[in-house]
Design a protein with these regions (language model features):
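Active-site neighborhood of phospho(di)ester-bond hydrolases with catalytic His/Asp-centered motifs
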Residues: 33-36, 52-60, 89, 204-207, ...
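Conserved beta-strand hairpin/beta-sheet module of binuclear metal-dependent hydrolase folds
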Residues: 1-48, 83, 144-146, 153, ...
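Active-site metal-binding motif and surrounding structural segment of the metallo-beta-lactamase
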Residues: 37-87, 115
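Metal-dependent catalytic neighborhoods of phosphoester/phosphodiester hydrolases
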Residues: 67-75, 99, 272-281
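A short helix->loop->beta-strand "cap" motif at the edges of active sites that frequently abuts
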Residues: 80-84, 257-261, 287-289
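Metal-dependent phosphodiesterase/nuclease catalytic metal-binding core
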Residues: 117-264, 276-280, 284, 306-308
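Short acidic, glycine/proline-enriched helix-loop-strand junctions
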Residues: 272-298
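Active-site neighborhood of divalent metal-dependent phosphoester bond hydrolases
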Residues: 80-115, 270
Length: 308
């Protein structure tokens, strides 16, 4: 899983930061979380590719959606034929449709808009799911968690070969798939050579929000939490009034949730060139492996929890 930050600014862009957008690539699929103005140019600039199958919108403030019409048009110009799904908070479909129609854009490829509520399983695939959770902003909003299923346990090849005398071959595959096999006159059960299931990865994206219990629950043991941090701690009151979070508050929430890595984004223009200040405020309370203020174009790999 690779996460590329396309836009990390607050409501107003700067020369260094574009409005909100994060692209996640998982096993060849590409998911876009929010699509602020200029997102398609960022995709070109940072070579992420345009083969996005789903756009997950947290809310309909302009800095999170104004890039959608232009991206849809470019996909059309590129002769896209695959369907594209846009997921947005319940009750916002008509606004989203008006935004797209206002540009005169009518994609020739299938475009579907799905409305989601907190608690919905937005996507349910064989190896992962995307779930919506409640956030607290000044308008209808949700966050999203991409949660992978548990993986098979490790296969103990040494035990299979040396202790049980099973030579490498088809029986290994059957055992790893959970099927017992016959060998040397006895039945070998999978659990004899296969360890316990290993957890998949959890990626969580909040969009704009005050700190919430629902976010902490969705981010429990997350491998990467991308949480907004619009303000420094001396503006905590202002953050609450405007439906936002401070860097320290995001770190406190990440601590409670047992998050492994915390990326701070949606940085106000007042902190241009002051990313370290926000990092320092967050790292003073965050006990995970790493907290960082994300930059446009920054890409990080999210390893499996048991990766060495």
């Amino acid at each position: 899983m690779r996460v590329t930050f396309l836009g990390t600014s607050g409501a107003v862009p700067t020369t260094e930061r574009n409005p909100s957008a994060v692209l996640v690539r998982r096993e060849g699929e590409r998911f876009l979380f929010d699509c602020g103005e200029g997102t398609q140019r960022q995709m070109m600039r940072f070579s992420t590719g345009f083969d996005v199958s789903h756009i997950f919108v947290t809310h309909l403030h302009g800095d999170h959606v104004l890039g959608i019409p232009g991206l849809l048009q470019t996909l059309d110009f590129n002769d896209r034929t695959d369907p594209l799904a846009i997921h947005a908070p319940h009750g916002t479909r008509s606004q989203l449709e008006q935004l797209i129609e206002a540009t005169g854009e009518r994609p020739t490829y299938p475009l579907r808009i799905h409305q989601v509520r907190p608690g919905d399983t937005v996507l349910d695939r064989e190896e992962y799911a995307v779930e919506a959770f409640e956030t607290d902003h000044r308008t209808k909003s949700v966050g999203y968690a991409l949660v992978e299923d548990d993986r098979k346990g490790r296969f103990d090849r040494q035990k299979a070969e040396e202790e049980l005398g099973i030579p490498p071959g088809p029986k290994y595959s059957k055992l790893h798939a959970g099927e017992p096999v016959e060998h040397d006159g006895r039945t070998v059960q999978p659990e004899e050579v296969v360890g316990p299931p290993r957890p998949g990865r959890r990626f969580v994206y909040t969009g704009d929000t005050r700190p919430t219990v629902a976010t902490a629950e969705a981010a429990q043991d997350a491998d990467l939490l991308v949480h907004e941090a619009t303000f420094a701690e001396d503006r905590r009151d202002r953050a609450g009034q405007t439906g936002h979070t401070t860097a320290k508050q995001a770190a406190e929430l990440a601590n409670r949730a047992g998050v492994k890595r915390l990326a701070l984004t949606h940085i106000s223009t007042r902190y241009a060139g002051q990313g370290k200040r926000l990092e320092d405020e967050a790292s003073a309370v965050f006990e995970g492996e790493r907290v960082f203020v994300a930059d446009d174009g920054q890409a990080i790999d999210v390893p499996f929890p048991d990766a060495e």
